[in-house]
């Protein structure tokens, strides 16, 4: 189905009964073609979806609530349009289950069906202790730079020094807009790499050039990955973007050149 038929940016009615057909799939290939990515993916990874509006009823009609974390593989055929996922989750509000674990399995199966991949994850009780994380690596945001490009993203700004390093850097200045609604997506990006050293000032300008860019979170992550990879011959590269919550959901893409990558800790940063 074309993206124009999705519910993004449109007035919606919340259904009062469970409906898996609310999930709207978007083929990844649509946006990857723009980036020159074919089926031979240049990365491995996952999209981490944290969902804060999950509720259903137990057998006595009493509400249950939880926080969900779901992992959609980067090699899935489709992604899920975020507003459709929000409407889908809210269709469980009057749905009776034996346990929250039953709800968890239903959601995992539905997500696996629509993405054509094995989706994993779980629903946590809301009294689970949460520890805020701090972005790892060197923060590059305090550089005194002049910026005048806020879109489209300019990969010519990615420059490097003729010195080999293995390091981790991060920035809290990433901002783009939803492809359909134009609503802002605010993110913290963590980059780990091994190879020629990125020039921090020019790279920060590159990140800031996404400011008025209209793309989905997953596409922004993959564009940054591809742009770095094409600019510098690296032995290793991973990027992890933690986006702030919108509509009760935050999406955190992770991409890596390492097939045996370790999942990010998924600790919330302060803006989540």
From Swiss-Prot:
Pathway: tRNA modification; tRNA-queuosine biosynthesis
Reaction equation(s) it catalyzes: 7-aminomethyl-7-carbaguanine + 2 NADP(+) = 7-cyano-7-deazaguanine + 2 NADPH + 3 H(+)
Residues the entry annotates as binding substrate: 80-82, 217-218
Keyword Cytoplasm: yes
A Gene Ontology molecular function term of the record: preQ1 synthase activity
Keyword terms: Cytoplasm, NADP, Oxidoreductase, Queuosine biosynthesis
Active site: 178, 185
EC numbers, comma separated: 1.7.1.13
Gene Ontology, cellular component aspect: cytoplasm
Chief location: cytoplasm
Compartments in which it is found: Cytoplasm
Binding site for NADPH: 82-83, 246-247
InterPro entries named among the record's database cross-references: GTP-CH-I_C/QueF, NADPH_dep_7-cyano-7-deazaG_red, QueF, QueF_N, QueF_type2
Any Gene Ontology biological process: tRNA modification
Family: Belongs to the GTP cyclohydrolase I family. QueF type 2 subfamily.
Subunit structure: Homodimer.
PANTHER family: NADPH-DEPENDENT 7-CYANO-7-DEAZAGUANINE REDUCTASE
Role, per record: Catalyzes the NADPH-dependent reduction of 7-cyano-7-deazaguanine (preQ0) to 7-aminomethyl-7-deazaguanine (preQ1).
Name used for this protein in its record: NADPH-dependent 7-cyano-7-deazaguanine reductase
Classification of source organism: Bacteria, Pseudomonadati, Pseudomonadota, Alphaproteobacteria, Rickettsiales
